Amino acid sequence: MRSSDDQPSGGTTVLQRLLQEQLRYGNPSENRSLLAIHQQATGNSSPFSTGSGNQGPQNDVLSSQDHHQQQLVAHPARQEPQGQEIQSENGVMEKQLSPRMQNNEELPTYEEAKVQSQYFRGQQHASVGAAFYVTGVTNQKMRTEGRPSVQRLTPGKMHQDEGLRDLKQGHVRSLSERLMQMSLATSGVKAHPPVTSAPLSPPQPNDLYKNATSSSEFYKAQGPPPSQHSLKGMEHRGPPPEYPFKGVPSQSVVCKSQEPGHFYSEHRLNQPGRTEGQLMRYQHPPEYGAARATQDISSLSLSARNSQPHSPTSSLTAGASSLPLLQSPPSTRLPPGQHLVSNQGDHSAHLSRHQQHLLSSQSHQGDHYRHAQASLTSAQQQPGEAYSAMPRAQQSASYQPMPADPFAMVSRAQQMVEILSDENRNLRQELDGCYEKVARLQKVETEIQRVSEAYENLVKSSSKREALEKAMRNKLEGEIRRMHDFNRDLRDRLETANKQLAEKEYEGSEDTRKTISQLFAKHKENQREKEKLEAELATARSTNEDQRRHIEIRDQALSNAQAKVVKLEEELKKKQVYVDKVEKMQQALVQLQAACEKREQLEHRLRTRLERELESLRIQQRQGNSQPTNASEYNAAALMELLREKEERILALEADMTKWEQKYLEENVMRHFALDAAATVAAQRDTTVISHSPNTSYDTALEARIQKEEEEILMANKRCLDMEGRIKTLHAQIIEKDAMIKVLQQRSRKEPSKTEQLSSMRPAKSLMSISNAGSGLLAHSSTLTGAPIMEEKRDDKSWKGSLGVLLGGDYRVEPVPSTPSPVPPSTPLLSAHSKTGSRDCSTQTERGPESTKTAAVTPISAPMAGPVAAAAPAAAINATAATNTATAATNTTIMVAAAPVAVAAVAAPAAAAATPSPANAAALAAAAAPATSVSAATSVSAANSISPAAPVAPAAVVPPAAPVSPAAAVQIPAAASLTPATVSPTAATATAAVAAATTAAITAAAAAATTAIQVAPATSAPVPSPASIPAPATAQASAPTPTQASTPAPTEPPSPVPTPTPALVQTEGPANPGASSGPRRLSTPNLMCNPDKPDAPAFHSSTLERKTPIQILGQEPDAEMVEYLI
């Protein structure tokens, strides 16, 4: 701890200066108190060293009055002079501590102390006396730890107490109060309000240390307080009040921070008489009787109550002194029934000791006063009474009839010992806090001293700097004066020099005039020479211009000559190209003529053979069942017929190849012509632009021509690559066709039994187109994916065919047993040209009395592409004819199909029974022409007859076709059964007359001026269909007609297909009920569509317009999986 000697001399000067500033500029209400503090800190330190107790009352009264004046003034905000003031107070207070610690003089007796305490208590609050009788509890924790539970001594050792010495020094208490006020203001605690209210007012809700625990256990304003006071709520208060160092003077030297449970292990060990206090806790009461002690306590209480309204400051002190009662931990207290019996002299000692602590710790917060009043008054009653709620008169009455029981006095004394011990512990804690404050204040004082020293240093340095600045100013002023003098001298010299220079210039002006006159003469001569040279230069320039014009003329003539040469070269190239093209066209013409001749020969041969076969078939149909054929004889003929068919198919494929080669050559030549014409026009245009452009040179035109030729070369190379690819594709297809032919030949050899009667049942075969011949076959044409060119359309008009020879006579169909096989669909054609397809038109019948046979033909479709050529229509005719014998049923399908259209399925059920069954009708379809003025119509009618006497003659109808959308005509012939049936169809509904159980489904579609007929075996198995390709038009008509038959056969309606145009159906000839075994004769008129008039079909006897030869379909599915593609 610092003493007063350790303070630096500079600190007093700084403090005086700060106090003077505060007195001059601060608040006038605080100037008086600050002045008193300053006087006490500087020159009134003598009362602290006096040890007599005579002047204590006067100082105490004065200090209490000063404190009262200070308490009435609200605490201002903390300022720097106040901080210095606190340090000065602490420094003065520290001066008194060291002499008091070594001073062990005798204190007044108990009576003197009691009288002095009563005198000083006269200014206290009236109810403070009750604080001595609060029902305390014994510190059981300290007892179990071996520490003294009662800290007071016997009357013999009571003179060692230092409380009365503090009472003699009143201004010390005043300084401590001021110090506490400043410390509380520094730590943020509000100023104490002046105590003007009643002392026993109930606790306020906004009390500083009130919480849920304290309000529910201790601070109840009404009702009896509990016997065991739980003060846990006091632990939650703010920073502890910082007491001055005089609270426990004997502890100041030790200055140790102790654990919470060890506050009294070294309690005042520096005083010699305190060591034996622990042995005398349970001594008997001293010479003062219980009645006297009770009387003293009662008189003290009464005097305290009577002096209540006179000193609010004393009431603050009393309220603050009872605060440590609330700050002891609740674990150190016991119920009132567990009091330890102590002597009565301890209680008397507690009074004087408590006076000291009341006066030394008065600067506690004023809000605790109400708590102390409630806790003190509740201890004097029974546990079930609520003394805090009584009025002041009743409280005064409760103190007066206090009994003079020695046991009660002992219990009260013991309680006071407990309370004071707790208070002493709390004071010890606050003393430690004060030590920390003092250390901080010392640091602040040191800092202030440093600031003052720094200020003095600054004053010295500033004075030195001012002296230096003054010297420099004087020096600079002298320098400026010297420079002014030097400037004046320089001006004088400048004026002198100017005068001398003017004199020299005047002298040299005459020489200058002479020189100028000479220079003028030379200048005139030079001017004349310049004019001569300019005239010569103009002559040279004119000559140069003439020469340039001549050069330009010659260059232009040269460029024109070169352009003519280039133009002649280009024309020569073009003519050479034309010559080459003519040669190629001549070669193509020769090849075309040879192919046409060869094709005509083949077609003639085939037509002759087919006519013979047709005649034989008709003869066999007339004979019927009456003349059964010999199987063994027929097998050889069938094999021979199959061999002939294969040879014919090979010839037909060769003819197709020749034809398409010619087509390719023609198209290639035409394309070359078109490209050359376009190139010629572009070249002429470019040449014209170049010739008319004056700024373009020969090199630019040459570069443009070279670039154009390169582009043409690139395009030609690209076309060559395309042609090579197409040729390779054609070669691959030819090889594939050859393989198919070989496979078919092998199968035909392996299955002779199935084909023994095919020659008699084959109405038509795939042949090449017949040009304007008298007889022909049904045409089959397939339009390819690409758009046909105009040459192909013109070529289509030259091919005409006829069905007169084939269908002019009777058409006989004999029952031939065969195995049903699915009709293979034709694959889509991918080239840009139309070709003739070969399809096998074999008819297969099956042995055995089967009830129903269904022939399903899947649609064959190919995408129609090309804005020039319309969607090529085609006709698909599916005719199913079946004649029932005793043991066999025959299904015959005649189909005319084209690649881009759908081939519908035709179901032709036939009843198999012992009796003769009705015959199936044949389906006929006709195709109309598209909008490209290329029309083709084909009508085929076929019927199976059991009785030769009942022929059916259907009429083929070709419906008109719109210019854009194709039309399909469907004709369903009538078939006769055992019973007579007459059917009259209508053109609007396109129905047919069918015999007892016959159903004919016909699908007709249009193709671009191409039609074909395909005869396929009727099967019940489904046919695999290729990728679906939209067809331009399909038509299907089916109408089962009930007949008057004894044993009707089952009918099966096919799936309907939308018909774009109404079909005209005409059926002629009633059925003959009597004819059951003879063959049925079918007569079909021939058709010929005029290409010039597509809307009006024309009927002719032997001609039919068609385009391409027909293909022969293979007997197995493998024969139709691949077609000849371009």
From Swiss-Prot:
Residue segments, region Disordered: 22-87, 188-252, 302-403, 745-764, 813-855, 1019-1102
Chain residue numbers at which the record places covalent cross-link Glycyl lysine isopeptide (Lys-Gly) (interchain with G-Cter in SUMO2): K573, K574
Compositionally biased residues, Low complexity: 321-336, 1030-1049
Coiled-coil positions: 408-668, 700-730
In-chain residues carrying the UniProt-annotated modification Phosphoserine: S693
S-S pairs: none
Organ and tissue specificity: Expressed in brain, skeletal muscle and placenta.
Subcellular location: Cell junction, Tight junction
A GO CC term attached to the entry: bicellular tight junction
Entry superkingdom: Eukaryota
Biological process, per Gene Ontology: actin cytoskeleton organization; blood vessel endothelial cell migration; blood vessel morphogenesis; cell migration involved in gastrulation; chemotaxis; establishment of cell polarity involved in ameboidal cell migration; gastrulation with mouth forming second; hippo signaling
Additional notes on this entry: 'Motus' means 'motility' in Latin.
Domain comment, as recorded: The angiostatin binding domain (850-1047) allows the binding to angiostatin.
The family this protein is said to belong to: Belongs to the angiomotin family.
Subunit structure: Component of a complex whose core is composed of ARHGAP17, AMOT, PALS1, PATJ and PARD3/PAR3. Interacts with MAGI1 and angiostatin. Interacts with YAP1; the interaction facilitates translocation of YAP1 to the cytoplasm and tight junctions. Interacts with WWTR1/TAZ (via WW domain); the interaction facilitates translocation of WWTR1/TAZ to the cytoplasm.
Protein name listed in UniProt: Angiomotin
Species: Mus musculus
Phylogenetic classification of the source organism: Eukaryota, Metazoa, Chordata, Craniata, Vertebrata
Protein's gene: Amot
